Amino acid sequence: MSLTRRQVTSAALAAVPVALATTGTAQATQRRRTLYITGDSTAAQKYADAAPETGWGMALPFFLREQLEVANHAVNGRSSKSFVDEGRLEVVLEAIRPGDFLLVQFGHNDEKSADPTRYTEPWTTYQDYLRQYVDGARARGARPVLATSVERRKFDADGNAVPTHGDYPAAMRALAEEERVALLDIQALSIALWQRLGVEETKKYFNWTATEQDNTHFNPPGAIAVARLVAAELLHRRVLAHRDVRRLDEEVPESWITWPDAAA
């Protein structure tokens, strides 16, 4: 389905920055920085009709302090290409300001070679589209951050977690080095986590229900676990400082996840 620019802009308004907290008059007089998320369904906001499916972007604010806001613009089914072609990156870049962050995680849908509206080739068009995010953020005084795609739940017969993203993570790593962009290697970190948890325990992190066995999307514990990886890497890669993060070693109750009603 094609979207008009008006429809894209209207949809993007639903992704307004979520304030993590409001404290003190000093903070009220100083604009807080915003971390914008661009990505696919693994990060996107989910609504009541999709529960218990949860995007990791819904849980990220639990690990960031009040001086940061999160604006989750990730959308189900998008690739680095279709997000640009639909005008969604333009909407983000119109809102982003100096000192903000643009976190970019695409790959799941870039892999769909049968769909020309989404497919990108890892070492050419994928990198070309990612450069548009990097260049757009830098041109506006914001800091781009690339994140390799979180891994799906897939194990071989011997119980080994199997990578599913082909050359896309390597292509992003190479681009990050070439462009001197901070890289969060969520693909490597998540597959290591799934390996530690094992075949059965990982089912508790993905959207396995009585009617569905979804090995791509998360439930609340899975989204919280991936968001914790993202926040820890933002600190480790010196994108954020210790004063910007919280709860990295603390339990976050899954009851904190809520699903609003979808906008009409």
Which positions does each model-derived feature cover?
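N-terminal export signals
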Residues: 2, 7-28
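Serine-esterase "nucleophile elbow" of acetyl-processing enzymes
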Residues: 27-74, 90-98
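Cell-envelope and extracellular/periplasmic
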Residues: 35-37, 41-44, 64-66, 73-79, ...
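Acidic-and-aromatic substrate-binding clefts and catalytic sites of carbohydrate-active enzymes
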Residues: 49-52, 80-86
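Short, conserved aromatic-histidine micro-motifs
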Residues: 70-72, 245-250
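Alpha-helical cap/lid subdomain in secreted, periplasmic
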Residues: 88-220, 224, 229-246, 258-262
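A recurrent domain-boundary module in secreted/ectodomain proteins
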Residues: 251-259
